[in-house]
A protein has these predicted regions:
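Iron-associated oxidoreductase/ferritin-like identity signal
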Residues: 1-161
Length: 161
């Protein structure tokens, strides 16, 4: 089915964001794991995989609309050098995605592509949950301090692979 060119462009922008997020969350997962914050690392690994599912949904929709998914371009990764920076970097990326998805959903509605609109709205809802989670983590750090916050996320002595 031939899709609206601007809708396909928005879908590719969403795909680019998700591909970037996969890598950013994965590297943060590996950093957290390396620092011994195994419980926290598990959450970041799960987020990376969730972003992969989002990318798959964009890819599927682009192909359905006879577009071509551009998987060769990523945005610059925002990599934190400590726990608080990791959360701040991921929060900035999630806000960026939410803003894009809101703009895209509005355009798709006007273009009468309700399936693409619904996809953007569904993923926007997921991003809002991520934003809420990350803001809560920053609030906790502010209230209990970084040392106590990270202490809660230390795992066992076994290495995670």
């Amino acid at each position: 089915m031939q899709g609206d060119a601007k809708v396909i462009d928005y879908l590719n922008k969403g795909l680019r964001h998700e591909l970037t997020a996969i890598n950013q969350y994965w590297l943060h997962y590996r950093l957290l794991n390396n620092w011994g914050l195994l419980e926290m690392a598990k959450v970041w690994r799960k987020e990376s995989i969730e972003e992969m599912n989002h990318a798959d949904r964009f890819t599927d929709r682009i192909l359905f609309l006879d577009g071509f998914p551009n998987m060769q371009v990523l945005d610059p990764l925002r990599i934190g050098q400590n726990v608080k920076e990791i959360i701040e970097c991921d929060l900035a990326a999630e806000h960026s995605a939410r803003n894009l998805y809101q703009e895209a959903a509005t355009y798709c509605h006007g273009a009468k592509d309700y399936v693409s609109r619904d996809l953007f709205e569904k993923l926007m809802k997921d991003e809002e949950h991520h934003i809420d989670f990350l803001e809560t983590q920053l609030d906790l750090i502010g209230r209990v301090g970084l040392e106590l916050y990270t202490q809660k996320h230390i795992g066992g002595l076994e290495s995670e692979s």
